Amino acid sequence: MRCPFCAAEETKVVDSRLAADGYQIRRRRECTSCKERFTTFESAELVVPYVIKNNGNRVPFDANKLRVSLSRALEKRPVSADDLEKAISKIIIQLQSTGEREVPSKLVGSLAMDALKQLDKVAYIRFASVYLSFDDIEEFTKEIEKLRE
């Protein structure tokens, strides 16, 4: 692997261990030329299915779009960035494990809601209000009652 500091082609692995989510290997590398150290992450490359939107369009799954949506719901909530990334990784793994080449956007939304329900109930309600298109306070109340059960 090329050194990101001096572009030398030879680096050596100094340390290797499983990353926190268990699906990646974290490696500390050292450049044999400039002696700088850097971290790399190695993971299996699995195909994430296309998403079939409500209008019938098919688009590639965009993890960043999911990250932005969940981050917006979690704004000013006591949830760490690490917990958010773990939730996103879990959603991606669930999508990959369907074995399907295409999944409906409703599945992605449902998985996102399940993840938020586990992370933070307030963020879940925020996300649900947009995702489920709440029209009035009654719909909010019904969803909150479901959470209490």
UniProtKB/Swiss-Prot annotation:
* Presence of the UniProt keyword Disulfide bond in the record: no
Q: What are the protein's UniProt keywords?
A: ATP-binding, DNA-binding, Metal-binding, Nucleotide-binding, Repressor, Transcription, Transcription regulation, Zinc, Zinc-finger
Q: Which InterPro entries match?
A: ATP-cone_dom, NrdR-like_N, RNR_NrdR-like
Which Pfam families is this protein grouped with? ATP-cone, Zn_ribbon_NrdR
- The record's free-text note on cofactor binding: Binds 1 zinc ion.
Tell me where on the tree of life, at the top rank, the source sits.
Bacteria
Annotated GO biological processes are:
negative regulation of DNA-templated transcription
Q: Where is the ATP-cone domain?
A: 49-139
Single GO molecular function: ATP binding
Residue ranges annotated as coiled coil are: none
Zinc finger boundaries on the chain: unnamed: 3-34
- Name its co-factor(s): Zn(2+)
**Keyword ATP-binding found:** yes
Matches recorded under NCBIfam families: transcriptional regulator NrdR (TIGR00244)
Alphabetical list of PANTHER family matching this protein: TRANSCRIPTIONAL REPRESSOR NRDR
Q: What does this protein do?
A: Negatively regulates transcription of bacterial ribonucleotide reductase nrd genes and operons by binding to NrdR-boxes.
In the record, the note on similarity to other proteins reads: Belongs to the NrdR family.
Question: Could you tell me what this protein is called?
Answer: Transcriptional repressor NrdR
What is the organism of origin for this protein? Actinobacillus pleuropneumoniae serotype 5b (strain L20)
